[in-house]
């Protein structure tokens, strides 16, 4: 075994060099590349080079929202924890997750729905532009779709990367059909770590 001796501060840079090498010269639009590479770096999964889908001018739209202090709402505390708080603070943004709140649990119980869907309803009442970052619950994306098509709430941006088997593929396709600016991982793959990685990639484009 030939170990690489890399200084701690150089590990991320070296990782991105390896990603670049293993993509064998594939070209990606300049705005998309940092997001794509950050997700691959987080997961070590090169499938994202093919299944990560961006709506037209998605990155520009997301960056503009972040520059203007949009609220990021996540569907898991894990995704919220993974978002870089220093970068958030530099831009005057905040990340929220309603999943563990008693109010969310009570609303879900009363309406016979999931806490993820109830979290979306709470996000709809924030009264400010929302970037919804979903890495776990397809029911959150489905509830977003219901709000969008009903015309009563539309998130400013959707990061749709839930992972799993039940309604995961379908929920992502629904979001992609709405016209709302989005970054979606088509298929079954995703996760809270992927949602956080996408948010961080966008934040770093503005703060590093």
Q: What feature does the model see in each segment?
A:
Residues 50-65:
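A short, well-structured juxtamembrane/interface segment
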